[in-house]
Every structure is written in structure tokens, then in C-alpha cells.
């Protein structure tokens, strides 16, 4: 009987997780995400159209955090029977604030903003298109800001599943001023 009671206590103790190491001020994390840009009048999933990113996060007070992200986005712009590749390499620095959470602090909805700078490359830097036409838009340095919305789910005390959407405003771009995207990934809080 004692063995069964000790076994039951041990199973209950291991099934319950301690939340003492979550969302501590100055706690850092590393996040890796993949996603797709949302292009108006285009299918969501397209060949050679993707976004990847790596972020470093640092929790501040009251469950909010600051982040620094490096993002690479690739999409194809249709031109006749071919495509013109558009690539962006961006560095984002921002802040996320919790809007909602459950009572156990397992799921959060965050909203935030960021400032960004980067480089936009159009047609791999070539100014002549495959049919001989001259491309008037050009590759250049871009800057701007963004709005972010994310749902974060704790899978364990240090591992989170993150699903998010963002809208970036790229000033200086010849192609699009507003670039929405959706992404999903994982964060490890150290």
C-alpha cells in the first residue's frame, strides 16, 4: 500500500510543472520562425516565396519583452510569363506587450511594434529583365517600422510555440510600402 501511495504521489508530482522559471525579468530567449508573405490577389503558398527569421528576446517587467530579429523574406513578382524575384534582408528591434493570458500563464496573446532597417534586392540586382525590358525599380536600403501580433503557447517551462502575424512598412521601397506576413516557430527561453 505504501508503494502504491508513493508511486501515485510521484506521478502527480512529475505531472504538475512548476512555473517558477517563466517570464522572469532579464530572462533571454532564442526564437526561430518560418512563414509566408501575404501578397494581395495571390495564393498564400507559392514556390520560392517564404520568410525565415531568428530572434533574440529579453523579458522585461510584467511579462512584456523586447526583441531583436534578423528576417529574410523572398517573394516572386509576376511579370509576363516569368517572375521577378524580390528579396529583403531586415533587422528589426521591437517591443511586445501581453494583451491576454490564461490563468495558468500557459497561453498569451501579444501585440507590439518594431523599427527596422535592411536591404531590398530586386531581380538579383539586374536591371534588365529576361525579355530585354529595363527594370525601373531598383535595389536599395530600406527602413521603417512594423506592427506585430502573436499567440505564444508554453509547451514546457522553457519551450514555446509561437504563431504570429506582422505588417511591415518599408519606406524607400520601390515595390510595396506595406508587407504583411504570417509565421510560426519555436522559442527557447534560457
Spans of features found by a protein language model:
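Outer-envelope beta-barrel architecture signal
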Residues: 22-30, 62-66, 105-111, 139-141, ...
